[in-house]
Each structure stands twice: as C-alpha cells, then as structure tokens.
Amino acid sequence: MISIMMKVSLAVFMLAGGIIKVSRVPFQVEHWRHYQYPLWFLTVTGILEIAGALAMTAGIWNRYAAIGAGVLFVVLMAGAIHAHMFRARQSVIMAIQAMICLIVSIMIIMGSYT
C-alpha cells in the first residue's frame, strides 16, 4: 500500500512538473534561463517527466515500468539538483524537492526488486 502511494505521489508531482515545462509557464522559463539551458531542453525535460509519470502509474501493476520510470527520475532529479546548486548557484533549500523525488525514486527502484 505504501509503495502504491509513493508511486502515485511521485507520478502526480512529476506529471505536474512536466505539464508546467511543456506549457512553458513564464516562471519556469525564467528559471530555465537562470540555469543557462536552451529552451528546447525545457520541452524535452517536460516530455520525459510526463512519460515517466505515465510509466510510474503503470508501475503500480508492472514492476519493470516502475523500475524504468524510477531510473529515469533518478537521472532527471540528479540533473535538477545540479542545475539548482551548480548552474544557478542556489542554496540547498532550492533543491530539496528534487532531492526528495530522487530519494523516493531510489526507494521505488529498490522496493521493486523484492
């Protein structure tokens, strides 16, 4: 039950983030410029987040989908942490959401092997 709640929570969070990126909401575009990434990468990242959210939802029934989505999210969240802390030189506080998603993704991956 906890595993399902973690998967659903992570999927909803990532889906929302993906939609915000693909829609190019002004505050997200501003953040992306601050990270000094090209705007096409914003769209690609959003599409990957949406695809991962769908795969994580499928992961409720298929552990391989959960593992694949978890690995994708680990890569994306490592990139998000890097963007906040090193590219934009923000404090650790700005990267907390990405760190939580990274930890939850790792927990889902590890839990899928049992």
Curated annotation (Swiss-Prot):
Pfam families: DoxX_2 (PF13564)
Superkingdom of the organism of origin: Bacteria
Chain ranges passing through the membrane: 38-60, 64-86, 91-113
Organism: Bacillus subtilis (strain 168)
UniProt KW keywords: Cell membrane, Membrane, Transmembrane, Transmembrane helix
GO cellular component, as recorded: plasma membrane
Name of the molecule in the record: Uncharacterized protein YdgD
Record's subcellular location: Cell membrane
InterPro entries per UniProt: DoxX (IPR032808)
Gene (name only): ydgD
Lipid bilayer topology: Multi-pass membrane protein
